[in-house]
Amino acid sequence: MALLQFGGTLAPKLGEKPQLLPRSPALTRVIYADPRFLVSKSGSGGRLKHLVSPTASLQSRTSSRLFNHAPSPRFRHRRSSRFIVRADADFYSTLGVSRNASKSEIKSAYRKLARSYHPDVNKDPGAEQKFKDISNAYEVLSDDEKRSIYDKYGEAGLKGAGMGTGDYSNPFDLFESLFEGFGGMGGMGGRAARNRPMQGDDEAYNLVLNFKEAVFGVEKEIEITRLEGCNTCDGTGAKPGTKPTTCKTCGGQGQVVSSTRTPLGIFQQVSTCNTCGGTGEFSTPCNTCGGDGRVRKTKRISLKVPAGVDSGSRLRVRSEGNAGRRGGPPGDLYVFIDVLSDPVLKRDGTNILYTCKVSYIDAILGTTVKVPTVDGMVDLKIPSGTQPGTTLVMSKKGVPLLGKSNARGDQLVRVQVEIPKRLSSDERKLIEELANLNKAQTANSRR
């Protein structure tokens, strides 16, 4: 590694000549590329504090302001007017370990964080970037040579020595290589995991029942449309007679890494390969299913609806949903119940409500009336002296308890006493006689 002399300072040459922004004969600042680092020297007695990559120019208004104005709170003041801008990334902080941590401690910290932030487990928007940062940090700190250079010169020193982070074409490679032999991660990452059989999606069906069907249950034949395995390709999605090849877009990884250069450095984003859909393989698609391995078909199935369901009830029929991919198990069928209302009977949980109208004469003298129930017409005795609004209970005439057909609710009958607005002369005469009799009885009771 060549050394360049600038005044009283020797600076290693990391690929290109450092840029000089002299402000005065007594103050010379050596600037290297990574915008996160500024290397400064004041006077002839100063010494080089950090090495960084020479890829960015500070010949701009932004850079000029750095030297012509007071430093921001991010700058740490030193003697002899020296200042240092620290890098935002710290591999030790990323893994949550101290700078003197052992390799086993670093490995343990990485495994714990990688499990938490792996995109297959953590769906937060920033989890994928966090996972990449963790992988980069572990890649450096787990290698003795890289760690030594990083401790001395930072990340830029690794770049200058041709040992930058990102040696793995995909951060998932590092993750998989570390967890290989530990029983896997339950389907997290990796082409093998992404090629595993996948369970099919659930299918939904809306079923409308009348009032009595919901109360007592019914057996219905329904017609559903769902995805079933393609018979032409046996569910592989590949054209018969052809063999899958490694995807050229992702190199068989199932994921691609896109890099974007910004003023703050190079940002990388990992995404599923659009060419192979994350499988890492490319096949000539089947002419029947278009490469999906499944086709949509219609099927009639017999459904037994239990007694006691209500609007909003959901029935689950196992393995009657959409077929899985690559030979995976099918999903389930969920049947959502909607119950039509009855014009006479109302439902309240497992109880049935009914309003019975009786004349004031029947309410006074008592009577027997026929009342509609889910079991048919039933005689109900109205006791004499029944008051308006009285509720009579017809035991076990309600809705069966869902899952326990031998247990039923009640039918609650609310008595509505009808008082006539008009009376005949004979009716009025009789009621007046009754009123006079009532007055006489009241007067006698007060004596």
UniProtKB/Swiss-Prot annotation:
Family matches, as InterPro entries: DnaJ, DnaJ_C, DnaJ_domain, DnaJ_domain_CS, HSP40/DnaJ_pept-bd, HSP_DnaJ_Cys-rich_dom, HSP_DnaJ_Cys-rich_dom_sf, J_dom_sf
Binding site for Zn(2+) 2: C247, C250, C273, C276
Stated induction or repression of this protein's expression: Induced by UV and hydrogen peroxide. Down-regulated during sucrose starvation. Transiently down-regulated by heat shock.
Major subcellular location class: plastid
Annotated GO biological process: chaperone cofactor-dependent protein refolding; protein refolding; response to heat
GO molecular function: ATP binding; heat shock protein binding; unfolded protein binding; zinc ion binding
Zinc fingers typed CR-type, residue spans: 217-298
Binding positions (Zn(2+) 1): C230, C233, C286, C289
CXXCXGXG motif repeat segments: 230-237, 247-254, 273-280, 286-293
Domain J, residue spans: 90-154
Function: Plays pivotal roles in chloroplast development. Is essential for the regulation of chloroplast development and differentiation.
Family statement drawn from the similarity comment of this UniProt entry: Belongs to the DnaJ family.
Miscellaneous field: Plants silencing DJA7 exhibit albino lethal phenotypes, display abnormal cellular structures, organelles and chloroplasts, and strong reduction of the expression of CAB1R, CAB2R, PsaA and PsbA genes, tightly associated with chloroplast development.
This protein's name: Chaperone protein dnaJ A7A, chloroplastic
Organism for this UniProt entry: Oryza sativa subsp. japonica
